[in-house]
């Protein structure tokens, strides 16, 4: 039986683990920045929350699969509306992709959110993130709108997708 754990990132060692995940996912980060991710990018991701969101709604976690740290998930509860989860980041190391692990981990998260009585999950995917779009479509997410969001490089078109759970 697969064992999945979400680990709170609350010390420098765990921040370095998160950075390691970022560095091993160059496909995604090349879409949003010309620079390699740094520890300050990790720290920024850990603390950044939209206006009006409480700190207890923010969940930035390492993903451990059978005792191996291989991903990061960052999500907000009850955002942008009550009973909705917004996943802001879900990445798996490049060398661990295409093995069904992302799907197993997402199903674990989905079940956990459903058990906590959330009704839907929302995500935003860069238009040019073909790997991400393919993954989320396989998880039965449907496009609800498109918008432009500011990233380090520039404004980028994002496809907002949603799934009822």
Model regions and ranges:
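Residues forming the Rossmann-fold NAD(P)(H) cofactor-binding site
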Residues: 103
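Conserved catalytic-core motifs of GNAT/GCN5-like acyltransferases
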Residues: 124-126, 137-158
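Conserved GNAT acetyl-CoA-binding A-motif
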Residues: 113-124
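Helix-turn-helix
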Residues: 132
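Extreme N-terminal starter segment of soluble prokaryotic enzymes
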Residues: 2-5
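Acetyl-CoA-dependent GNAT
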Residues: 8-95, 106-108, 112, 147, ...
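Short hydrophobic/aromatic beta-strand or adjacent loop that forms the aromatic wall/cage
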Residues: 58, 156-161
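Active-site acidic-Proline motif in GNAT/NAT acetyltransferases
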Residues: 93-95, 99, 127-128
């Amino acid at each position: 039986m697969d064992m999945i754990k979400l680990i709170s990132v609350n010390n420098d060692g765990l921040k370095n683990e998160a950075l390691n995940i970022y560095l091993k996912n160059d496909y995604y980060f090349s879409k949003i920045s010309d620079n390699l991710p740094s520890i300050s990018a990790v720290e920024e991701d850990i603390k950044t929350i939209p206006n009006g969101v409480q700190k207890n709604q923010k969940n930035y976690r390492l993903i451990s699969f059978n005792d191996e740290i291989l991903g990061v998930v960052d999500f907000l509860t009850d955002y942008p509306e009550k009973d909705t989860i917004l996943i802001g980041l879900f990445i798996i190391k490049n060398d661990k992709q295409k093995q069904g692990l992302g799907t197993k981990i997402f199903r674990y998260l989905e079940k956990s959110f459903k058990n906590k009585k959330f009704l839907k999950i929302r995500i935003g995917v860069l238009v040019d993130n073909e790997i991400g779009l393919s993954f989320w479509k396989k998880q039965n997410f449907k496009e609800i709108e498109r918008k432009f969001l500011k990233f380090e490089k520039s404004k980028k078109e994002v496809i907002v997708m949603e799934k009822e759970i």
